[in-house]
Amino acid sequence: MFARKPPGAAPLGAMPVPDQPSSASEKTSSLSPGLNTSNGDGSETETTSAILASVKEQELQFERLTRELEAERQIVASQLERCKLGSETGSMSSMSSAEEQFQWQSQDGQKDIEDELTTGLELVDSCIRSLQESGILDPQDYSTGERPSLLSQSALQLNSKPEGSFQYPASYHSNQTLALGETTPSQLPARGTQARATGQSFSQGTTSRAGHLAGPEPAPPPPPPPREPFAPSLGSAFHLPDAPPAAAAAALYYSSSTLPAPPRGGSPLAAPQGGSPTKLQRGGSAPEGATYAAPRGSSPKQSPSRLAKSYSTSSPINIVVSSAGLSPIRVTSPPTVQSTISSSPIHQLSSTIGTYATLSPTKRLVHASEQYSKHSQELYATATLQRPGSLAAGSRASYSSQHGHLGPELRALQSPEHHIDPIYEDRVYQKPPMRSLSQSQGDPLPPAHTGTYRTSTAPSSPGVDSVPLQRTGSQHGPQNAAAATFQRASYAAGPASNYADPYRQLQYCPSVESPYSKSGPALPPEGTLARSPSIDSIQKDPREFGWRDPELPEVIQMLQHQFPSVQSNAAAYLQHLCFGDNKIKAEIRRQGGIQLLVDLLDHRMTEVHRSACGALRNLVYGKANDDNKIALKNCGGIPALVRLLRKTTDLEIRELVTGVLWNLSSCDALKMPIIQDALAVLTNAVIIPHSGWENSPLQDDRKIQLHSSQVLRNATGCLRNVSSAGEEARRRMRECDGLTDALLYVIQSALGSSEIDSKTVENCVCILRNLSYRLAAETSQGQHMGTDELDGLLCGEANGKDAESSGCWGKKKKKKKSQDQWDGVGPLPDCAEPPKGIQMLWHPSIVKPYLTLLSECSNPDTLEGAAGALQNLAAGSWKWSVYIRAAVRKEKGLPILVELLRIDNDRVVCAVATALRNMALDVRNKELIGKYAMRDLVHRLPGGNNSNNTASKAMSDDTVTAVCCTLHEVITKNMENAKALRDAGGIEKLVGISKSKGDKHSPKVVKAASQVLNSMWQYRDLRSLYKKDGWSQYHFVASSSTIERDRQRPYSSSRTPSISPVRVSPNNRSASAPASPREMISLKERKTDYECTGSNATYHGAKGEHTSRKDAMTAQNTGISTLYRNSYGAPAEDIKHNQVSAQPVPQEPSRKDYETYQPFQNSTRNYDESFFEDQVHHRPPASEYTMHLGLKSTGNYVDFYSAARPYSELNYETSHYPASPDSWV
């Protein structure tokens, strides 16, 4: 199309090659504003007129040919659009592979048109030469080597998208400033393999089409020295790599300057500008194939002088056309380097190719009045812009689902067939395949892009060059031009690959007038906004053709568009906008966006489902957005999500739906609605199928894959949250067929594999722990143990030996008791069939999986959950609790629990200590713990002079309290254990705590330690040893004002101090000597009082308020011996960290919901705050681990539980069982 100039023959006015000095930038070339006729006579004037008339005819011919060629392209685009509409998804997914490059061959008729264009160019060349030879035209103003400027933007950009080309036939003055540079193909930063690896490149020739050859990628060129003539500015000339002046091949680089800078530095042609972003740049070459690449160069912290960011291209877009035989080349132009403009006052126009006007309406009006004359707008007469949303025939955008590590593609927006005012978008947005849901399970990028910022691909359109966008590293102002001018498009190559944080950077920057801008105004100074109009671009108001950012109401309105691709793109853009921005999330809710997104869940197109779910997941992420969660529920969002989950087979959509449900489940108000609407579907459609429970004979590899399923992980996370919603929620989940079996199967199949530490296993364990909470009180099997059984246990145990000698009554009762006992050996009584369903929650067979987790798992949350489950199961006087305690001893679980006391994790130590306390309710367990675990328990107490104080000081008050309570239970009615506590140095530490007067420890800890000391003083036989060690009665009892009235009655009187933090209830005396029958009678008479107190405690506990001291003492007197932990909900941020007492209906300690990435990025990093933003495990509040020992005047679960179920004062463990396996290991 263009004749190549021989090496070294560039005219004086041609743009210098890189090796030329920067002063050559003054010699930029353009057509003179007017023809110089002052030195010629009349004949010269007539000759000039004839030449100009000839040129005008050529322009008209060019316009006609261009129209014909554009018509051909529109026909091809229409055919492609019809093919695309016939597919189900309306996308070009077959073309989304990053390993392929497609070449759209031109029609046969286009060859003829291009030949005519070439012929026309030669005629224009001859006219210009005639003007120069006659002396009319200064050779420095125009050279034949630069005749490509005669082309209209339509002629030069024929390989833009058929769906809406920017380029249209124009006049001789063509909105293009062209400069010629000489270079060799070897010096171009060719993009061969990398181009294929990072984005699609469609090769379209503007003239005689040649196949695109992707040769081997040359080594990245070193950063060249600063060359101002080639650095980009508002009117950005292209910059070239270093090349010898006598290069064998020529490459034409020309730029379309939206806002050329005014003349500066005394030169009317060169205007260096610093800190300006490059605009769309094109490179062309003689009749060779052309390939486009558009690296992205933006940063959320760029200097304010850069132009306002656009809807899709908030950074400069550099489009380079390479010669044949070369790989597609990318030249990344950082927006902050200095540059020079090669422009002409007449021919440098604002063509806005690939970008759009960034001036606000006011500024553009002033700008137009100052800069434009009446001849500037003839170009726009035929170049009308098409509204992107219309997506009419030949210009409807395709929606291609592409890999997350690829860059979004440029979308053409104009069509000569559709005269619609421009509105908001210039590219179709595409969400990424958001499959990385946690830092530990994120999908890493390919090696070429690991650790770099990479946006997800925007949809490609038929026959359109894919233009990947990339960020450059201009973060904090202008960078050195030498280091930034020639960045390779490779993300890791070159010293200029200086990128900002790839995770939280904004990809798109709205315009100045958009209230949703994430970076604020970014207009350059007024002085830099001047541009020179051409003769044909002065008539019309340029504001008609300026592109702007979409306003939020417009994007929300597009959710109702008639084309699914527009709806999908709008939803994906909303997902991007609201990422990490709670204000935008609230605004979307106020403008009705949530309702429209919920409506899209029932759409027929899969892509719409995907984008809508992604937007909803971001909208309902975070504690600050509970209003959005409730709004989604009020819009019918939960049933809509459930319907979509039930009918879709797309794995990504199932992940998104379950992710939205997980986010919703962290809101307390939505837990029961989720259980009502989604529990059955989550269980039957996700958990059971993905667990593999129904087909247990599956291969082992499938089991491992199931555990890594994000859908299963999300579903179990959702149920983990809702399982803490209260008694009704637990009851429904226990009764849900297959749920308990599937959760246990997930755990059992993970044992011995690397998946034992996975989040899915953690969620399953925590669900089972919650469902194990208050089993005896909330299940029908537990409630069968009513008053008759209580009476039998009371009579048989209370009278002790007297019952044996009193005749048939006592013997019968003892016989019944012995039949109900199981000491860990032989078959279980009352258990003829294998357990199933809810029975598996309390059956002793569940002990072994829990103990295996405790011995093999390294996930502290899983360890805490398993220990808490055993703690819940071993609580109380229910016969299954007795069996659980025996089973733990049989399975050698006590050493496992004691070993966990030594790990450096406060929450795990707290859970294990409490579990040991419940295990010590069994007499044999108590003996073993006192013999083998006393030193470990004492070691965990703060204080003393040993070298382990540092670790103890780091323990929370809850953990210290739990250890004290365990010690108290171990020494109760066991003098040998009390002596072992003294021998282990426990007295010194306990006295140090009790005498701290609250300076170092909370009152709760002080009181718990005082209770242990008081219990030790009750053993009169040990007092001499205490005095021998230097201790007196003052050290044991003086600091505990609450036990004054019990100080005179030692254990020899067979009485446990009634205000002991552990022995606070009738049930709490299970391991003490039998009480008198009169006490047993009084216990039964107080039953109604217990129930009333329980209701009162429940009320105050639910309110999270302190009860009165009277209520607290009553609750203590009615408590049970077992220390029950509250339900272990999934961590949730919404619980109050200053809450002093846990609730009967517990909540989660920290939020486990998540928000996805920005929809157009994929990174090895995964989440922002929680699950889909950053899976950060927030430390549970102290309230969740408050030991409910009557140490605070608050209603708590122990009070509530004991009031609801006033069990026997004595436990099964009172007697010894000779056949029990009592060995420690």
Curated annotation (Swiss-Prot):
Name of a matching Pfam family:
Arm
Its job: Has a critical role in neuronal development, particularly in the formation and/or maintenance of dendritic spines and synapses. Involved in the regulation of Wnt signaling. It probably acts on beta-catenin turnover, facilitating beta-catenin interaction with GSK3B, phosphorylation, ubiquitination and degradation. Functions as a transcriptional activator when bound to ZBTB33. May be involved in neuronal cell adhesion and tissue morphogenesis and integrity by regulating adhesion molecules.
Spans annotated as Disordered: 1-51, 87-117, 134-242, 256-312, 432-483, 514-542, 1042-1077
Residues bearing Omega-N-methylarginine are: 209, 264, 282, 296
Location in the cell reads: Nucleus; Cell junction, Adherens junction; Cell projection, Dendrite; Perikaryon
Q: Which disease is it linked to?
A: Defects in CTNND2, including deleterious missense and copy number variants (CNVs) are involved in autism, a complex multifactorial, pervasive developmental disorder characterized by impairments in reciprocal social interaction and communication, restricted and stereotyped patterns of interests and activities, and the presence of developmental abnormalities by 3 years of age. Most individuals with autism also manifest moderate intellectual disability.
**What name appears for this protein in its UniProt entry?**
Catenin delta-2
Result when mutating residue 1159 to S: In a colorectal cancer sample; somatic mutation
Primary location recorded for the protein, binned into one broad class: nucleus
Q: List the disulfide bonds.
A: none
Composition-biased stretches, type Polar residues, lie in 20-51, 98-108, 172-187, 195-209, 299-312, 469-478, 1050-1059
Indicate the segments annotated as coiled coil, or none if absent: 49-84
